[in-house]
Amino acid sequence: MDLSKAYDCLPHDLLIAKLEAYGFDNDSLQLICSYLESRYQRVKIGSCKSTRRKIKIGVPQGSVLGPLFFNIFINDLFLMSLESEICNFADDNTIFACGNTIQEIVIKLENDLGLLLDWFSKNGMIANPEKFQIMFLGLSDQRCLRLNIEGKKLPATDTVKLLGIQIDNKLKLNKHIHELCSKVNQKVSAFARLNTYLSPDQATKICDTIILSNFNYCPLVWLFCSDAANDEINRAHKRCLRVLYQDFESSFQLLLSRDNSQTIHVKNLQKLMTEIYKSVKKLNPSYLWEFHERKEVTYDLRTKDLCKLPKIKKRYGSESLSFRGSLLWNTLSDNIKQSPTLAAFKNQIKSWTGDKCTCRLCL
């Protein structure tokens, strides 16, 4: 669900009223009022300036308190009684529903979207139904599917972009990876034109921070991608290394050896192991712990650092992070798993190559 300038639309008086309802005392409310009020803005075009106007809505952008105030303001949205489930990250809201028939799902979504749009309107927020993205999972042809929102028929699409990740109606990420590799290849082309003017150290820094860093966004989401998608990633990675070292003859493995690095897939496996270490040691948010739980043992056995393997019924489940990650974690040496600190674990996992991984990309 698309919101226009969500952080700039928060009414100050309604925000203060909600803070008071949540139990903020009078001194705290006065301090927050002082923080929000007495702010002015004006427009300058050339040498001409408009008169100053008081800002009555919105929270200061770039501040630490801005996102906190927004989360408090929108918190009662999730107290509504909906038939659908709602997920939120900052001002990005997504609802999803399931049912026995398409018509049942459509009715649930239309009813709940009506309630949500009413909430946005009453709370001074501007929603753009025309920009809402709608997708029905599992259906090959969605062209005839529509949702009626505020009298407008909005069509369903085959793919949606959720927090920067392209997902299709089969929950495949091939399109996202294709666009990601296209972006990397464009940067490699620009890098090739500049490389002759750069020192080796400068070229390496550009390669790592501007080009290959594109693969660092949500890598665990597309970690166990298709063979074709993984091949596309490797081709982009190889092209980058060839330009970096001006070596257009060596194989990908020789280039990796020269660069003293691993494939993107192995790097992502290392990141997965790091996240599991954090879950086992309770270093990350508690809602992630259930995905990788330690086996409960009574005695001090070698299995005390192993993770439970979730039960799976289909092959699809065997490619999930919870199953594949726990299975791979259990193959790590005790020396790595029992690292005393996160820094020590990260240092040791760098040399790990995932040689015992049994996913289809490693076999």
Which residues does each PLM region occupy?
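Conserved catalytic palm subdomain of right-hand nucleotidyl-transferase polymerases, strongest
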Residues: M1-E20
